[in-house]
Amino acid sequence: METKPVITCLKTLLIIYSFVFWITGVILLAVGVWGKLTLGTYISLIAENSTNAPYVLIGTGTTIVVFGLFGCFATCRGSPWMLKLYAMFLSLVFLAELVAGISGFVFRHEIKDTFLRTYTDAMQTYDGKDDRSQAVDHVQRSLSCCGVQNYTNWSTSPYFLEHGIPPSCCMNETDCNPQDLHNLTVAATKVNQKGCYDLVTSFMETNMGIIAGVAFGIAFSQLIGMLLACCLSRFITANQYEMV
């Protein structure tokens, strides 16, 4: 059987695949960084033990960028052992992305179970200064919400007794003063009416779903690369025997 035309075809396909693979590495890296920067504040409030999915994606994406270039080099060199190493790496990437995808998908469904407790705890220990308190402020400002179900939840917090409702709840912070925020009746006209529970859980479920979907989609594409690399390695080895 003539193997050279098959080898040429497989090389072309694998080089194209390796380039696309490299692009997916850049995408994974970008999604991981985006997930950490965009969702980091929400994750710190939603879970007692935050998900590692963004970190897994960042690490995997960086590694893929490097090995995507290695895949192109191995294909051009036509080295069977390099191609086998490339296929082995693709299998490891497949497993890593599968773990990241499952982590994001499972965590997405745990959000509602943990948010009520952790966010309520954050409100009870709120002092307006520490990292967790600043995370609460960030959520309330960015989503224009207040409290868990609504602004009245703040009335049970120690902070309310001294300072009233936090200014981050205000629709317009320049129009809020401490006296208004101490009075729930007056505050009703000054602060956001929507609670953060529904808004945050919906936001997180949507965005963690994106992370999981990207990871799953790219993970299963590795199977194509593994097949191409193994086939090319086999045909190159067979061609070497034909030439002997």
UniProtKB/Swiss-Prot annotation:
It is a multi-pass membrane protein. InterPro entries: Tetraspanin/Peripherin (IPR018499), Tetraspanin_animals (IPR000301), Tetraspanin_CS (IPR018503), Tetraspanin_EC2_sf (IPR008952), TSN6/7_LEL (IPR048232). Pfam families: Tetraspanin. Its main location: membrane. PANTHER family: TETRASPANIN, TETRASPANIN-7. Belongs to the tetraspanin (TM4SF) family. This is Tetraspanin-7. It comes from Pongo pygmaeus (Bornean orangutan). The gene is TSPAN7.
